[in-house]
From Swiss-Prot:
It comes from Rattus norvegicus. Ca(2+) 4 binds at residues 202, 204, 206, 213. Binds the snake venom phospholipase complex taipoxin. This is Reticulocalbin-2. Gene3D superfamilies: EF-hand (1.10.238.10). Its main location: endoplasmic reticulum. Ca(2+) 3 binds at residues 167, 176.
């Protein structure tokens, strides 16, 4: 028997879903710069991962740390000129983000695949997420605002699940599950992501998202002289980050840069931070000597996922 969600838990479920949807980039920035101050150990955690990995890194001898770090440096140096540029560091950090996202999805796949048959069904996904199978009528709105919001989110998840299922089998295989969890990483999900965003934000159905639609339900207080700070920030993002052709609206490709989590900015910021801190001769790039001289800083950065890469032979295994 399929059940709807228990009303008592709807509020909590909704909050959790909303938090998960928006927390990625802002959470990374908050952890990196709490109260606006740079946190040095954030870099190591990004490179190494969880505290257990950091502890394991500390156990490595100094020579072994250097050996593995030198191997990583060679891999980052894509043109083999002996220096790490902003672009090389940024590309490496983005690759690291993607690698660990894929690793996490693989771990989740095992947890969701309750009967260990190599696929995750929609029912298994529901059981893992909500401890029961939830099924909503697509055509019947709910009176309660929170319940209706949850229904909409749940139906969107179901549509994404169905889109990820390329072979129309009873469930998702690993590759399809990754597409479901990280549609931004899979080409065949791009059109779905854009369409989903247009359905949510394009209120007049013209195929674009205007500034007004971008800001949602915001209306300026008639007694206020100016917009609040957060609105000014959002307007600036619309104009300078997303509306590339400056036509006052977001086309589908511009919309994609808004709705899909984008690690490029975070990676570029970290690359610039490392060069700024470690570039001893001000040539805007890092030599192996500069990195080894500032080894602790480099191993507390996203470039090595806070040192985590020293324990993952996907990154450090190479001939020196």
């Amino acid at each position: 028997m399929r059940l709807g969600p228990r009303p008592a838990v709807l509020g909590l479920l909704l909050l959790l879903l909303l938090y998960a949807a928006v927390a990625g980039a802002s959470k990374a920035e908050e952890l990196h710069y709490p109260q606006g101050e740079h946190r040095a150990d954030y870099d190591r955690e990004t490179l190494l991962g969880v505290q257990e990995d950091v502890d394991e890194y500390v156990k490595l001898g100094h020579e072994e740390q250097q050996r593995r770090l030198q191997s990583i440096i060679k891999k980052i140096d894509s043109d083999s000129d002996g220096f790490l540029t902003e672009n090389e560091l940024s590309q490496w950090i983005q690759m690291s983000f993607k690698h660990y996202a894929m690793q996490e999805a693989k771990q989740q796949f095992v947890e969701y695949d309750k009967n260990s048959d190599g696929t995750v069904t929609w029912d298994e996904y529901n059981v893992q997420m909500y401890d029961r199978v939830i099924d909503f009528d697509e055509n019947t709105a709910l009176d309660d605002t929170e319940e209706e919001s949850f229904r909409q989110l749940h139906l969107k998840d179901k549509k994404r699940f169905e889109k990820a299922n390329q072979d129309s089998g009873p469930g998702l295989n690993l590759e399809e599950f990754i597409a479901f969890e990280h549609p931004e990483e899979v080409d065949y999900m791009t059109e779905f992501v854009i369409q989903e965003a247009l359905e949510e934000h394009d209120k007049n159905g013209d195929g674009f998202v205007s500034l007004e639609e971008f800001l949602g339900d915001y209306r300026r207080d008639p007694t206020a002289n100016e917009d609040p700070e957060w609105i000014l920030v959002e307007k600036d993002r619309f104009v300078n980050d997303y509306d590339k052709d400056s036509d006052g609206r977001l086309d589908p490709q511009e919309l994609l840069s808004w709705v899909v989590p984008n690690n490029q900015g975070i990676a570029q910021e970290e690359a610039l931070h490392l060069i700024d801190e470690m570039d001893l001769n001000s040539d805007k790039k890092l030599s192996e000597e500069e990195i080894l001289e500032n080894q602790d800083l480099f191993l507390t950065s996203e470039a090595t996922d806070y040192g985590r890469q020293l324990h993952d032979d996907y990154f450090y295994h190479d001939e020196l």
